[in-house]
A protein has these predicted regions:
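Amphipathic protein-protein interaction modules
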Residues: 68-111
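Short loop/turn elements at secondary-structure junctions
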Residues: 18-21, 30, 93-147
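Conserved short "hinge" loops at termini or chain/domain junctions
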Residues: 1-78, 84, 132-147
Length: 147
């Protein structure tokens, strides 16, 4: 599975901009909360910490991890032969959502502490969901015979 870094960082920017814009009781919230290109160094650290969290959660299934030149990150998992391939796309989406939510949670720990815990919990749940899907085995089907 590959997580496209540019897509994740775009979603992080959208999420932080939205959160900053929607705060009605704080005039400086948007400027404080919105993650910009100037914050890339810190966001890069959070990107790497999210990779580590995925590897830790999926360490029994982990075969390899690789980073591309453009910063994208790929992980190869060893899954059961009974793994339901229909879950692959859902796993990829959930993994991408984990990265966005995890990075936003870590960012909010600095600039929006009220929402940081909720985002952290959501990130944990997303990663657990990826792990559950990786462990899921499709029930065997009985062979059918033509009479």
């Amino acid at each position: 599975m590959t997580v496209v870094k540019n897509d994740v960082m775009t979603e992080v920017a959208k999420t932080t901009a939205y959160a900053g814009q929607k705060m009605v009781d704080d005039d400086d919230a948007y400027d404080r909360i919105f993650a910009t290109d100037a914050d890339r160094e810190m966001l890069e650290r959070f990107w790497q910490e999210s990779q580590i969290a995925v590897c830790e959660q999926l360490k029994r299934q982990l075969v390899s991890e690789t980073g591309g030149e453009n910063g994208d990150w790929s992980v190869t998992l060893s899954l059961s032969q009974s793994f339901d391939q229909a879950l692959t796309l859902s796993m990829k989406k959930e993994l991408g959502s984990f990265f966005v939510t995890s990075i936003v949670a870590k960012w909010f720990a600095f600039c929006n502490k009220k929402e940081a815990g909720d985002y952290g919990n959501a990130a944990r749940e997303l990663l657990i969901g990826v792990h559950k899907k990786a462990l899921y085995k499709r029930k065997p089907s009985r062979p059918t015979y033509d009479a």
